[in-house]
A protein has these predicted regions:
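Alpha-helical transmembrane bundle and helix-membrane interface signal
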Residues: 117-128, 133, 146-149, 156-165
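Hydrophobic, aromatic-rich membrane-embedded alpha-helical segments
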Residues: 95-122
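Short helix-loop-helix connector
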Residues: 85-86, 122-124, 255, 300, ...
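Re-entrant/interfacial helical elements at transmembrane boundaries that shape
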Residues: 113-122, 285-302
Length: 367
């Protein structure tokens, strides 16, 4: 056998392996790296003691209970979008898809959204590109909301961030130089132009397939403009993000340190931590583990008393970080455990639903 005949297959496997490493290796490395950096600056034994002895788990339970509401609301909201492309799954199926997405993302970051689109398309025998497009529209709507929340937070609660700039000028300079770099924006513009040119003028089956795929995505996204129930969709969006905030807010009462920060500074502490953790969840990682705690502790530090500054009292600063880590790790661990256990139940229900459908389709018809 000519060894050259295996070369394309070998290259395909290499590409597949590289793709898997990018999809799963990078998010895992981010989660592990941030957790290692986090635990390096805290007293782990003291953190565990705080969780065991000081945490009021009733508020953590309330946090988890409130967390179920956004899943129900998101399922209802996506159902409105799917109706616009004539896809009408039962509500329980939408709930399975949304809950399964969160569970899927714990193990396979960023693939949960692809999975839910594929699941709905397969079960409802609908075109995948259009269902995927409606999902993209769903996530883009969330991106717009996050951007608006971020702007509002910076506009009305800029004092803590100004404090950060004065405390860490080097970090601010690095971020500013990156955002204003012509090389960064030029590279992004060049990549966009190349992609547009390939899709516009390229030929071949692959390019044609990609073009049709994006056409389906656009049709799913454009369906929002003509869908019925826009008012209900906007109301559900407001409820969704209000519940996300309420979920974090009630968790602040679970620990003495976070409760005291709320009492001293007001609800703005929770608002800023909510905004930062929401942005952090966009970083590819396993269920937000790593970025979530890092963003939460950073937000808490913005309101830390001067007496716990690292330059003034290193021991007190470490104790503050440890208490913040206890808070962040408890919240993310409880949510992750819920998604794992709930995900197992949901996937069992999906399997049972599939068996019922297969049995119904195989059953002989009686005339």
């Amino acid at each position: 056998m000519n060894p050259d005949t295996n070369q394309p297959t070998n290259e395909l496997h290499k590409g597949s392996l590289a793709s898997k490493l990018l999809k799963f290796g990078i998010p895992l490395a981010i989660s592990v790296g941030l957790c290692v950096a986090l635990f390096r600056d805290i007293d782990f034994k003291e953190m565990m003691r705080i969780i065991r002895e000081e945490c009021n788990f009733w508020f953590i339970g309330l946090n988890l209970l409130i967390g179920l509401i956004p899943i129900v609301v998101r399922a209802a909201r996506w159902g409105i979008q799917l109706k616009a492309i004539n896809v009408r799954p039962p509500f329980r199926i939408l709930f399975y898809a949304i809950f399964g997405t969160y569970s899927f993302n714990v193990v396979f970051p960023r693939l949960g959204e692809v999975w839910r689109s594929g699941y709905i398309a397969y079960r409802q025998k609908a075109p995948f590109p259009e269902v995927f497009g409606s999902m993209i529209a769903d996530r883009l709507a969330d991106t717009v909301v996050v951007a608006l929340l971020t702007l509002l937070t910076f506009a009305f609660a800029s004092a803590p961030f100004i404090k950060f700039v004065h405390t860490y000028p080097d970090a601010y300079d690095k971020i500013a130089s990156l955002l204003t770099s012509p090389w960064v924006w030029g590279g992004l513009a060049a990549a966009a132009i190349v992609c547009w040119a390939l899709l516009r003028f390229g030929k071949g089956k692959f390019i044609s397939g990609v073009r049709n795929f994006f056409k389906g995505i656009w049709e799913g996204f454009a369906a929002i403009a003509k869908m019925d129930g826009k008012g209900k969709w906007l109301l559900l969006t407001a409820i969704l993000w209000s519940c996300y905030f309420l979920q974090l807010y009630v968790a602040f009462f679970a620990f003495p340190m976070t409760r005291e920060l709320l009492e001293a500074n007001g609800i703005i502490v929770a608002i800023i931590c909510y905004m930062l953790t929401t942005i952090a969840m966009g970083i590819p990682s396993n269920g937000g583990i790593g970025p979530y705690q890092t963003a939460l502790i950073f937000g808490l530090q913005l309101f830390a008393p001067a007496a716990v500054s690292a330059s003034v009292n290193p021991a007190a600063h470490k104790a503050f970080l440890t208490a913040g880590a206890a808070f962040g790790n408890t919240v993310i661990a409880a949510q992750t455990l819920t998604f794992i256990i709930g995900g197992i139940i949901v996937f069992l229900l999906i399997a049972a639903d599939r068996r019922r459908n297969e049995a119904a389709s195989d059953a002989p018809s009686h005339k």
